[in-house]
From Swiss-Prot:
It comes from Methylobacillus flagellatus (strain ATCC 51484 / DSM 6875 / VKM B-1610 / KT). The keyword Magnesium does not apply. Gene3D superfamilies: Vaccinia Virus protein VP39. Belongs to the class I-like SAM-binding methyltransferase superfamily. TrmB family. Pathway: tRNA modification; N(7)-methylguanine-tRNA biosynthesis. This is tRNA (guanine-N(7)-)-methyltransferase. It catalyses: guanosine(46) in tRNA + S-adenosyl-L-methionine = N(7)-methylguanosine(46) in tRNA + S-adenosyl-L-homocysteine. The gene is trmB. Its EC number is 2.1.1.33. Pfam families: Methyltransf_4. GO terms for molecular function: tRNA (guanine(46)-N7)-methyltransferase activity.
């Protein structure tokens, strides 16, 4: 299931290894009884403890050759569960730091009997650096990351040039990176950064149509009715 660290763990070392700035703030969320029960009963089965060793993803899911997709920051996990249910041929690794969201997704894993989904409750940058092998991912989902809309907080944004280079090192040739946001200025920021990465190419002229596999969230549906926009940005690894 795991092997000693190899490969390109030092991508963006100057900017990432000593990173005092994180893209998230841990908040003390309240757990429901159902979420706590799911954490107690299902985290030992579907959770992957953080450790600085490279995962053998085929062994982790018990099958070889299936496409592997990483989702960073899955929130309460509703979209994650729906995507995993609709694509049983793919295996999904969800990374999230907030305990209520982890409990919520575990609850859905149990209800839907999903065997193609695993959870790592840890900082995504450290997971990428120390647990994901180079050229091992077929896709990466980053849906509605915190836009940190105040200019003085832009340094906290997840999508930065060094982070994108790290992602590219973990993606296979032909793998896709899909970012979705409902904050237009952040969409422009993401598009600009991804366009500057020489290892990525845009699958559209600018923003992409929403793929069928990404479900509409309740929040997104409410925003659409109010005339708010959502921007999907999909690039492919060269």
């Amino acid at each position: 299931m795991a092997q000693e660290m190899t490969g390109n763990e030092n991508i963006g070392k100057e900017e990432l290894a000593r990173r005092p700035i994180r893209s998230f703030v841990l908040r003390q969320g309240r757990l429901t009884h159902a979420q706590q029960r799911a954490l107690d009963e299902l985290m030992p089965v579907f959770g992957v403890p953080y450790a600085p060793v490279i995962l053998d993803l085929d062994s982790l899911f018990g099958r070889e050759g299936s496409p592997k997709v990483l989702e960073i920051g899955f929130g309460m996990g509703d979209s994650t569960a729906k995507i995993a249910q609709s694509q049983p041929e793919c295996d999904f690794i969800g990374v999230e730091v907030h305990t209520p969201g982890v409990g919520s997704l575990l609850k859905q894993i149990g209800e839907l009997q999903l065997n193609n989904l695993r959870i790592i409750q840890h900082d995504a940058v450290e997971v990428l650096q120390h647990m994901i092998a180079d050229a091992s991912l077929d896709g990466v989902h980053i849906f509605f990351p915190d836009p940190w809309h105040k200019k003085r907080h832009h340094k906290r944004r997840l999508i930065q040039a060094a982070f994108v280079k790290l992602l590219c090192s973990k993606m296979k040739a032909g793998a896709y990176l899909h970012v979705a946001t409902d904050w237009q200025e952040y969409a422009e920021w993401v598009l600009d950064i991804l366009q500057q990465e020489p290892l990525l190419e845009n699958t559209a002229q600018s923003y992409a149509p929403k793929p069928d596999y990404r479900p509409l969230t309740k929040f997104e549906n409410r925003g659409i009715k109010l005339g708010h926009g959502v921007w999907d940005i999909i690039f492919r690894r060269k």
